[in-house]
Design a protein with these regions (language model features):
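Acidic/glycine-enriched connector segments
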Residues: 1-165
Length: 165
């Protein structure tokens, strides 16, 4: 799978351990292990809280280029100050930053536009997805519709939590 572009989608902190520094470090460590295994040439991340940002941090740590595909310029407008600070720390490390829609937040639909851009511009999708409805499910469904290979990471994540933490 080396020399391919990986897009990532996954759950927010509520479903992957919470907002603590410890939870964030655990998720980033898992992201690093996943990146070492798949060895992508570059990664596309939607920069959402949780999995997306953990993957961005793991890319920085491993010196893997990543592309930030943001739904709009105010993606972080409703986040807690600590979350906004992390987002603003990560963005300058992106090789490129793309916005699904220009300007300010037009509504939740722009996140699906972003998801479709990520899937369209990647070779495969790595999904930290537990099967529940929501934005991650929508991204996975679009990737399936487009015939993209999907690496399902939920079971490896559960194993990691049980055996490595």
């Amino acid at each position: 799978m080396a020399d391919k572009i990986m897009a990532v989608t996954g759950h927010r902190p509520e479903k992957v351990g919470g907002y603590s520094d410890e939870a964030s470090k655990r998720l980033t460590t898992f992201a690093e292990e996943m990146l070492k295994f798949y060895k992508p040439e570059a990664v596309i991340t939607g920069m959402a809280l949780g999995w997306d940002q953990a993957v961005a941090q793991a890319c920085i740590n491993l010196k893997i280029p990543f592309l930030a595909y943001c739904p709009c310029k105010e993606q972080d407008r409703k986040w807690f100050p600590e979350s906004r600070e992390m987002y603003r720390y990560l963005i300058p490390f992106a090789k490129e930053v793309f916005y699904a829609v220009p300007g300010t937040y037009p509504g939740a639909w722009c996140m699906q536009v972003r998801n479709e851009m990520m899937v369209d511009d990647s070779d495969y999708l790595a999904a930290l997805y537990d099967g529940s409805p929501g934005g991650t499910a929508n991204c996975v469904a679009y990737a399936q519709q487009m015939g993209k290979e999907i690496k399902q990471l939920w079971d490896p994540w559960q194993w990691f939590l049980a055996n490595r933490c």
